[in-house]
A protein has these predicted regions:
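Short, Lys/Arg-rich nucleic-acid/phosphate-binding segment
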Residues: 51, 166-169
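Extended hydrophobic-aromatic, low-complexity segments
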Residues: 134-135, 147, 164
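A short, conserved structural fragment
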Residues: 157-167
Length: 169
């Protein structure tokens, strides 16, 4: 659904009652219609809100949702390398000054803890329609998915919010 941010034209229109937005039930109906239409055109849903022809999915998005390494290069870019999540300085003038002076243009850096990495694996992986591989989780973290999140997973299964399909949650 559309998130209307403060200090935008849409926000101002919404506050004046001049931007009619659908309610949650209508958004659900509209999204289900979208899924049906996209699939009828050969675009399959592979992530919460992304569709593509088979084998044409966004590599960048999938790397991100699979919690894999990616380098952020350029002003304002973000990266995740060797457990370090970072963002570069922006705008480009400041970025180029840093690089020109031989200084790494890192604005923020955070070493992701093992617990944070597991949490990220879950919330990022659950964005994909194929979910999270229990085998890959064990391979990455040396713990089974159920030993870490078993109670939560079962509660979500009981509420019919997620399902287990073979190796995947």
């Amino acid at each position: 659904s559309l998130i209307v941010e403060p200090k935008t034209v849409f926000y101002n229109l919404m506050n004046k009652g001049k931007l009619p937005l659908p309610g949650e039930d209508m958004e659900t109906v509209m999204f289900e219609m979208l899924i049906e239409h996209m699939e009828s055109k050969g675009r399959m849903r592979y992530e919460i809100s992304n569709f593509a022809r088979p084998d044409y999915e966004s590599i960048h998005n999938l790397l991100y949702w699979e919690n894999e390494t990616y380098a952020g290069i350029g002003a304002g870019a973000h990266g995740y390398v060797s457990g370090n999540r970072y963002s570069n300085i922006g705008p480009i003038k400041r970025y180029m000054e840093q690089v020109g002076n031989g200084i790494r243009p890192i604005q923020q850096s955070h070493i992701v803890t093992p617990v944070e990495a597991m949490e990220e694996e879950m919330f990022l992986g659950l964005r994909k329609t194929d979910g999270i591989s229990t085998a890959l989780f064990h391979e990455k973290f040396g713990q089974s998915l159920t030993s870490v999140y078993g109670e939560t997973i079962q509660a979500l299964i009981d509420k019919e919010l997620i399902e287990v399909n073979g190796d995947r949650v």
